[in-house]
Amino acid sequence: MKNIGRKSNMTDKQIKFFKELEIIQEQAVSMNISQSNLTKEELLFNVSYDTVVLMMELLDGYRNMVLELSDKESREILNKDIQLHDGVVDFLKSF
């Protein structure tokens, strides 16, 4: 675990993945920064909601990578035959 955060010890794909997460974080904040009419709690729900949706889009292949999300124990691929970014809207709160 001591390699975490050291780009020199990461593969190109790992760096690309973390760069996508960096972009997602920036986008989620930018999408919500001007919502001054919301309470702090509502704003936090929105930022976290948008972050998760954007991450699900990454897993769904709508960004610069094609990834699989799998359960290690059963090896079930969780993003097979489903759009995670569509499914998440039924579970998370947004204002």
Stretches found by the model and what they are:
Residues M1-L38, L69-E73, S94:
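N-terminal low-complexity, intrinsically disordered segments
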Residues T11-D12, L43, H85:
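Generic detection of intrinsically disordered/low-complexity segments and helix-coil linkers/edges
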